[in-house]
Amino acid sequence: MNKRGYECSQEDTDKLPESKRQKVPALASVIVEAVKVDSLQRLCSSLEPLFRRIVSEEVERALSRLGNAKLTSRSPEPKRIQDRNGRNLQLHFRTRMPPHLFTGGKVEGERGSAIHVVLIDANTGNVVQTGEESASKLNVVVLEGDFNDEDDEDWTREHFESFEVKEREGKRPILTGDTQIVLKEGVGTLGELTFTDNSSWIRSRKFRLGVKPASGYGDSFCIREAKTEPFAVKDHRGELYKKHYPPAVHDEVWRLDRIAKDGVLHKKLLKANIVTVEDFLRLLVKDPQKLRNLLGSGMSNRMWENTVEHAKTCVLGGKLYVFYTDQTHATGVVFNHIYEFRGLITNGQFLSLESLNHDQKISADILVKLAYENWHKAIEYDGKLLNCLPVAEKEIKSLLEPKMVSAQTAPNHQQLHNQNNRQTVQGHQNAITYSPVPQPIDYPQFAQQHCNQLLPSFPCNVQDYNRSMESSNDSSSYNGEDWCPPRAAGQGLEDIFSEEIRLRSSEMLETDDMQRLLKTFGIGVNTVGTQGGFGQTDESCYGYSIPYQAQIDNTYRRERNRGSGKAVVGWLKLKAALRWGIFIRKKAAERRPQIVEID
């Protein structure tokens, strides 16, 4: 039985669901599709000539390089190593190029310098100042930025010329002006040159300048061409927004990298009264976290690092600021142009940052914070106030141009203290010197000078020792220029004095006279370095204790504030001698045999 074929009638079609019926496109969608197709065809037709030109240029360039390579490989002398006189003549630029230049502006080197070219003999490194080649005429050309052959490498003229950049179709020559220079004794300077087109249309987006011998000047001798570093050429309209390298102190803050003129970051800085690079650096020194928070999340950490690095290349002026902590101007801190801490003034004398010890740095840190909180009290030194004072002018110059001061040229200590006693405000200004070594009266000098005289020949008993010390005070004199042995950087007075006392005491205890003296008290002393020797902290012996060191230090500080001179130094010696005698007697008494009652 044959099955009937499915016959679809109009009635059945009408009964189909709405989703299965063939939809008729709307008129609007048909128009949109037609417009899209037409637009795509127009776009393809407009891009086709551009693609054809780019491809043809690249193919020509590749073929020319391939042809030059083949021609060079067939040549018996592929490279111009030496001329007929055995010299290797090369042109070199002696001026670095800036990272950016602008169309319509004068072509200049870094920081606006003139661009110089020299002809040298690579075998000797000397400038060729004689001969026909020293007066050659050179052509200035524009090269591609990706001409990355090193200057110490050799290349052929064809290879050099393959990187030359020609003007675009319908454009003027890329470089206009004095495109030829003539060497004079092997040296030449580029004249007035101007770029007429930017470098954004070539692959590397950068240009190089190159020089090569003009036609007719390189036939009888071989000279290798020269090229500069790559640089970008921008449209002259961008010069109004040009960044400065390095920035000047009074440049507007948007001259710094990553800060666009009238941008969001620039407006934030202006709102905080940060108008110039100087304002930026000062806040960076005083409170870098505040500056970072001010810029906010709109500046990434990488952008922040670039901006700060660029700002720190700024060349500072010679201004100084001093903040005094008292009315006598005996103590204060010194800052540079951007409020960086540069040194400490103590007792009317200037100590540079590099010469401060640990304790002085802690004190200086407190004073610096105090100065920043009360900056309106700081005094500005711009050189005008001190011009009438030749001594002060010389010392301020030494502050701006740091240099080491030897111990032999240090001033007499007593003279310095006499000057401090009669200082006025101007006198304190004269006291600002840039010396890496503090110059008050050093107590270790007294210890070094007089321990050498007294301790090796220590008397046989304590009373004779005291009398000899008192008599030596009258006969000895203090010489401020008789310096103690040089000390290490950052070593304090207490460390030097304690070390000196320890060494001299060890020598003293090893003498026969001291051994006999101690035996009279029943004390047995071992040599240094053995168990229970001098300087150990064991209870069975005595040593140089910290409290005694503190007494010496306090005495030094009190006496230092009272004055100076031979009388004061004599009293210091006498006190030290008496304290040492009392110390010896006390320790000897502790070691005396005691009678113990035994049941």
Curated annotation (Swiss-Prot):
Name this polypeptide is given: Calmodulin-binding protein 60 E
Subunit: Interacts with calmodulin (CaM).
Annotated region (DNA-binding), positions in chain: 150-273
Organism whose genome encodes this protein: Arabidopsis thaliana
Family: Belongs to the plant ACBP60 protein family.
Annotated GO CC locations: nucleus
PANTHER family (alphabetical): CALMODULIN-BINDING PROTEIN 60 E, OS02G0177800 PROTEIN
Stretches the record annotates as Calmodulin-binding: 1-80
Superkingdom as given in the UniProt entry: Eukaryota
Segments for region (Disordered): 1-21
Predominant localisation class: nucleus
Subcellular localization, as worded in the UniProt entry: Nucleus
Keywords on record: Activator, Calmodulin-binding, DNA-binding, Nucleus, Transcription, Transcription regulation
Gene it is expressed from: CBP60E
InterPro entries found in the cross-reference section: Calmod_bind_C, Calmod_bind_M, Calmodulin_bind_N, CBP60
Function: Transcription activator that binds DNA in a sequence-specific manner, likely 5'-GAAATTTTGG-3', to promote the expression of target genes.
GO molecular function annotation: calmodulin binding; DNA binding
